[in-house]
């Protein structure tokens, strides 16, 4: 689970302008942080199937947002996947 401070730091790092919380970049960055946290949780709790389902839903949502961003602006997409260190 992300704390308010962690979430705020991620939003400030990836926002396009002041007060931007809904751009694809911010949404993907927040989902990536949540996915990383949940992945660590699942390494310890291998039989937590409910959380695994939530993880798969988050990965799917991130994939859709990345596909949208790639379609709209390929340069922003490439910049984002490089900054996050994820495969595109």
UniProtKB/Swiss-Prot annotation:
GO molecular function, one term: structural constituent of ribosome
PROSITE patterns reported for this sequence: RIBOSOMAL_S15 (PS00362)
Keyword Transmembrane: no
A Gene Ontology BP annotation from the UniProt entry: translation
Gene3D superfamilies: 6.10.250.3130, S15/NS1, RNA-binding
InterPro entries (alphabetical): Ribosomal_uS15 (IPR000589), Ribosomal_uS15_bac-type (IPR005290), uS15_NS1_RNA-bd_sf (IPR009068)
One Pfam family hit: Ribosomal_S15
Alphabetical UniProt keywords: Ribonucleoprotein, Ribosomal protein, RNA-binding, rRNA-binding
SUPFAM superfamilies per the UniProt record, alphabetical: S15/NS1 RNA-binding domain
Family affiliation: Belongs to the universal ribosomal protein uS15 family.
Subunit structure of this chain's protein: Part of the 30S ribosomal subunit. Forms a bridge to the 50S subunit in the 70S ribosome, contacting the 23S rRNA.
Function according to Swiss-Prot or TrEMBL: One of the primary rRNA binding proteins, it binds directly to 16S rRNA where it helps nucleate assembly of the platform of the 30S subunit by binding and bridging several RNA helices of the 16S rRNA.
Record protein name field: Small ribosomal subunit protein uS15
UniProt source species: Halothermothrix orenii (strain H 168 / OCM 544 / DSM 9562)
């Amino acid at each position: 689970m992300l704390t308010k401070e962690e979430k705020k730091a991620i939003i400030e790092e990836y926002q396009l302008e002041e007060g931007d919380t809904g751009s694809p970049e911010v949404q993907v960055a927040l989902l990536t942080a949540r996915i990383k946290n949940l992945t660590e949780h699942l390494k310890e709790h291998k039989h937590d199937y409910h959380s695994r389902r939530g993880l798969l839903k988050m990965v799917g949502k991130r994939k859709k947002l990345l596909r949208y961003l790639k379609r709209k602006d390929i340069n922003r997409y490439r910049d984002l996947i490089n900054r996050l260190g994820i495969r595109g």
